[in-house]
Each structure stands twice: as C-alpha cells, then as structure tokens.
Amino acid sequence: MRFNLKAPFEPRGDQPEAITRLVEGLRRGDRFQTLLGVTGSGKTFTMASIIERVQQPALVISPNKALVAQLYREFRSFFPENRVELFISYYDYYQPEAYIPTKDLYIEKDADINDLLARMRISALKSVLTRKDVVVVASVSAIYASGDPRDFQELNISLEIGQRIPRNELALKLASIQYSRSEDISSGGVFHLRGDVVEIFPPYEDYGIRIYFFDDEIERIISFDPMNRKTLEEFDRIIIYPAKEFVTTEEKIKHAVKEIERDLELRAKELEKNGKYLEAQRLKQRTLYDLEMLTTLGYCSGIENYSRYFDGRKPGEPPYTILDYFDKSEMIVFLDESHITVPQIRAMYHGDHSRKKNLVEYGFRLPSAFDNRPLTFEEFLESVGQIIFVSATPGDYELSVSTQIVEQLIRPTGLIDPEVVVKPTQNQVDDFIEEVQKVIERGERALVTVLTKKAAEMFSAYLNELGIRAEYLHSELDTVERVEVLKKLREGSVDVVVGVNLLREGLDLPEVSLVAIMDADKEGFLRSETTLIQTIGRAARNINGKVLLYADRITNSMKRAIEETNRRRMKQLMYNIEHDIKPESIVKPLYENIFEEFADNEEKIEIAKNTYLDGILALKEDLEAEEYLALLEEEMWRASSELRYEDAAMLRDEMLRIKRETKKDNI
C-alpha cells in the first residue's frame, strides 16, 4: 500500500519550499540534511509530507517519551490507512545491574515489563519486515539490542487452507516461537485448542486468528474480534510471527552453551593468573548456574548478557537492533530535536560500558556482557541510510555534515516569535510579579527559570505567599510528580511554574504567554545560546508571547539568541503583512495522557542515570586524582550536551571540590 497523507490543510508558509528542497535532497542522494524549524511551524506535517512524496519507510527518533507519544499520535492522524508504529523501552520499572567496588555493593537487575509496550515493539518489528508503508516513532531505544531479524523472519508459521498438520504439532510449533497455551488473552501471544478449532492471538494484532480443522487438514482460516467473537475477514493463507522479540532455536542454545563454557574456562584462568581467586570463583558459580537454567529451561536471568553467543556475533561486533529490520537503502531517518538526540545517541554506549566494566572486572559477568549494548554513534550511522536532522537549534555536528540547511521559520498560524525584553536584575522578583499579574488577569500562564533547585523551591513558595498559584519543577521530582505539575499548569489550577531546566520536559504549552529567565547573564550550561533560544520558544505558541531576560549585561549567548529570535520574528511579520494573516494562538486539546502515556516508563532512564552517577562518584577511591578529574570533566560535558544541566552542575561541583582539596594538600 502507498502512503496516503490525510490532513485538513495544505502546506503553507515555509512548508512547501522546505518539503520540495528536502525531497530533492533525498532523491539526489544527500546523506545528511537539516530542517531548521521553529516551534509551531508544523515540522511534523513537513516530515509526513516528505514521507508521502518519496514513498519510503521512515524511522523517527525523538529524545524523550513525552515527545515520542506526541509524534506517534500526530503521525497516526496523518496516516490512518498506513502502519504507524511505536518503539520505546518496554520497562515500567528498570534497575540495571551494577557493582560499586568502594562500597562492595552489588545491585541486582530488577525490572517490570509493560506487556502493551512489548506488544507494540513486536508489532513494529513485524511491520518493518512485511510492509513498505510504515513509520516507526521511537526513542533512543532504537539503538539498543533487539532479536536477530533472520530468526524473527524465519521462525514463523505459514498456514493455508488444505494444508495437513496435526493440531498437536501446530501447538508445539507455536510454543517454539514463544506462544503459550492460556485462556487469558489480555497480553496476546497465546493460543487455545478447542476441539477441531485452534485460536491464536498474535501480540502484534488487535484481532484473533481462528483455524478450523477437518481431521488434520486446515479447512478454514478467519480473523475475529476477541470481544464479541464476530468474524472479521476470511483468509486463504496466513503467517504467524513470533510472540516475543527475542526468539532462537534449540540448536543455537546448545551451541551457545558450549561457547559460554569455553569462554568461562578461559576467563576464570585469566582472573586466577592475576591473583583474583575470589572473582574467578564468583564468575564460575554465577555462570554455571546460568548454564544450568539455559540447558533445562532455555532461559536464565540476565540472558541478554549472553546475546552475542545466540546471535553468532564476534566480540566487539554490534548487536542487532530495529535498524537491521529496515532496508538501509530505502529507509529515511528523522532525528527529532537533533540538538538533544545526537548527543544522546553518542552518550549511550559510554554510559553502558562504564557500568559493565566493574561487573566484568569483579567476576559478576563474562566479557560478553560488553556486547549486550547500545550502538556507538559511528555504528548507528553505518546502520541507517539518509538522515534529516530536525530542530529549532541544530547542533554544530548537524550543521557541519548537512548538505543543506532548510529553514522553516514561518508559522501557518501567523504567530510571531515572542518579544524579548532585557531588564536589570535589581528588583527582578518584584518586576516579574508585576508582569505575571497581567498574565493571570488574561487567564494565561507563565514559566520562570532560575539557576538552582533551592531557588526554584523558595521562589515558588514566595509566589504562593503572595497569592500567586505556583509550583516548582526540578530533577528531584519523580516522573509522576513532574507530569502532575505540568497538567495543573495547562488546566489552570497553577499559574506559574518555576524550574531550573525546563527543556527536559518536551513542553508544548500554548497557554504560556510569559517566560522569565532570571540572571540571564550568568554564562554556563543553563544560559547558553541554544538553551536561551529553546527557552524563548516556550512562549511562541501564544499570541501574547513575551520573554523577560533579567541581566545587567548582554552576554554573547544572549546577543546571539536575541538576534536570532528577532530575525525569525521579522520574517514572520513580513509574511503576515504580505499575506494579510492575523496571528492566532494555538489551541491544543488537553489530552489526559499527553505527558502520562509513557510516564511510568520514564523511570527506567531516571534510575539508570542515578545509578550511573553514583557509580562515577564512587570511583574516586579507585582512581588517581588526575584520572578522576578527567572522568568527571568528560561526564560533565556529556551531561551538558544532553541538556541534563543539573547532573552537569553536580559533576562540575565535584570537580571544583576535588581541585580545592588537591590545592590544600599541595600547600
């Protein structure tokens, strides 16, 4: 089936030219292009239009779950007749395995899998393998391991009318590709045997399959609604794909066990040779237990650490990911919010490797654990075809590699970028209160950014004392609490949100007409050019948008951010005059789950980051001062590039503390 874009409007403003130029670039064979699109300019519609024009499968990667949910919903509305799939981590809760030597603390892996998200991942894999009209909207989970696409495609069951196959044999085949015999159909991946009928519930479909037998011959194949059991469609032939993302054969398990036994012997000898007898004994005990489980059950806890044995990969070779399910020569990749997504992809491998280093060195895991990992950035680039970076503030990398930078600065709604006003820091709080009162009188909302978590808490408390309904937002609030604060702001039960890094939320708040940036002249992570432009953009969805920069001097970052905002503002104003457009605020329905849809899943990231940061700080005792400082600096810049400014600030403070201690010791 061909992509068929459905929308109640045609491309407007800069969209027609942007679509044409980017499509020409794809057809020309350009490897990298950038769509520089401002907030509210319709970047998602532009991406959808490009997909329809070129008729190629697409992978859209976005940096957080809130944006993924938003994009998934929008692409589904644009392509109701085609397959739009979602591919994010399937964990509701995730505690990664880790070991902190200084505390002799082993943290066991703990996880809860969300059945719905697991089924959606399988649906995505199946769609990519079997269709051309597919858009997959993914998080950075796209660079983490998935099953071998050859196994997923080859280990299917083909059934057709007239085929002879005993029902018990069919049941065994279904079990071999991870279907279980059960009456509970809520999670999919199950089947029933009822007399001459076999009912199968694939996890990737919202309907069941019913196979009618006459003796051992298939007589009829239908799909049916599991709720009312009504027949939906008749089939002559059907293919049943695996019920799980990771499937393998008994032969591969036997071969893997032999390989693991060989590597265990070699690694144990290596540890003993280095005098690490405790570590060698620990490794033998843990690995032999895993091998026993694999031999008897075909599964063990932490089986992913042995994935390269099942995949037949050599040490160091990249894992299979959803990228391997695509035809590289046909796919298009859109990196949404690329100024965040590119650094995020770069950082994933290093964080994973650092955590596993201790597990391997101290005998908790074989070195094969290193090969259950995300792709490196270079491997990611090798795995995909043409890339279009999408951002209002593309990073240096995107700008340097792109054949063309296509601007999309005109908003179809006529909304102009907010007016930016610089005011002195003296009496900045009183001035803001005066400004926010006007906003509240109009029934609108405000955002304020400050430099520290303590300042956010104190400022919000002070506003509440004055009768202004305010809440604070920072990294110590868990995902559910952050979701609730933003929901209150949109509903109107809160007028002001005070935050430190308001970029992490993927905010889309048309009710916000005022953004205030306190101490805007304090150069650093939170006041860089990119951060300022992105924060200014938070007021760009409201006709009364205004931004206050409280500063006693104009920094270079402020100057560039103001100049760029004014350039975009003037272009929109000229367009509005030329086309007689009257600006209108964006009206966006308050979806109950706009931020909540995958909120619980976000815990995985929070927990992984916290464990990893604890691990970095715990390395102080194991490293020389210079090595420790170098590691802290590397991780600080990585956190900054991912816009995790609070983590970056914590690492910076630790660096300064170590430098002060070193200076004292040298006196």
Curated annotation (Swiss-Prot):
Domain named Helicase ATP-binding: residues: 24-195
Record bears the keyword Cytoplasm: yes
Domain of life: Bacteria
GO CC field: cytoplasm; excinuclease repair complex
Motif position, Beta-hairpin: 90-113
Span of domain Helicase C-terminal: 428-581
Any single biological process term in GO: SOS response
Binding site for ATP: G37, V38, T39, G40, S41, G42, K43, T44
Keywords of this entry: ATP-binding, Cytoplasm, DNA damage, DNA excision, DNA repair, Excision nuclease, Helicase, Hydrolase, Nucleotide-binding, SOS response
Gene3D superfamilies the record matches: P-loop containing nucleotide triphosphate hydrolases, UVR domain
Pfam families according to UniProt: Helicase_C, ResIII, UVR, UvrB, UvrB_inter
Record note on domains: The beta-hairpin motif is involved in DNA binding.
Alphabetical list of PANTHER family matching this protein: UVRABC SYSTEM PROTEIN B (PTHR24029:SF0)
Family per record: Belongs to the UvrB family.
Protein name as it appears in the record: UvrABC system protein B
Organism the protein comes from: Kosmotoga olearia (strain ATCC BAA-1733 / DSM 21960 / TBF 19.5.1)
Gene name of the record: uvrB
